[in-house]
Amino acid sequence: VRYSSEHKAETRERVLKEAAKEIRAKGPDNVAVAGIMARAGLTHGGFYAHFKSKEALVGEAIGTMFADARARSAKIDAAGDPRAVLRAYVDFYLSPAHRDSRDRGCPLPTLSGDFARSEPATRERFGTGVVGIASRLAVPLAELGYADAAAESHALLAQLVGGVALARAVGDPALSDAMLADTHASIVARYGLEAAQ
């Protein structure tokens, strides 16, 4: 059966969405192509019609993860006032909902350690996503007058990612909540975001 190019593109997108979810949940080394294909409603045999290898799938799924993150934050980017934009990012990123949605949240706190050990091409792709997020954070920082908004965005992103990663990693729910709340309070105070909501 020959499928239209539109059908093939939709199928490929479905596989990428499932792969992105699975990689976030289990890490790139612990996912199985057969399982991803089954969750996408396809057979394992159809995989190679869409991807050359598991590594190629992982590389493209990274792009899907960052595109999902961009789509979720588009409303925040459009908020206008730079303090409100920054506060909205911080509120979302350091929320219990984001902490608890490992399979749908930002890939940085979940996968940074995994991709640090990946092939150079995969790390480069992940790095492109990191730069994209940092660049979006740099916009309100520049509007707030930070001379080196790029450097400031790197520091802010590292604190956000670290806060969520540690909150996810600890076994004590109270400590996890405290990690989020304390990181949030520190960032809000540092950037003067108390009144911005």
Model-derived regions, located:
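Alpha-helical structural signal
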Residues: R12, L16, V33, H44, ...
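N-terminal intrinsically disordered/low-complexity leader segments
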Residues: V1-E10, E194-Q197
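Solvent-exposed, amphipathic alpha-helical segments
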Residues: R14, E18-A25, R72-K75, Q159-L166
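Amphipathic alpha-helical segments used for helix-helix packing
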Residues: V85-A88, R99-G127
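Hydrophobic/aromatic-rich alpha-helical bundle segments in the mid-to-C-terminal region
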Residues: P120-T128, L141-Q197
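Hydrophobic alpha-helical connector segments
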Residues: E60, A74-G105, S153-L156
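Short, basic, alpha-helical segments at the C-terminal edge of helix-turn-helix-like DNA-binding modules
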Residues: G63-A69
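Helix-turn-helix
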Residues: R14, K21-A56, E60
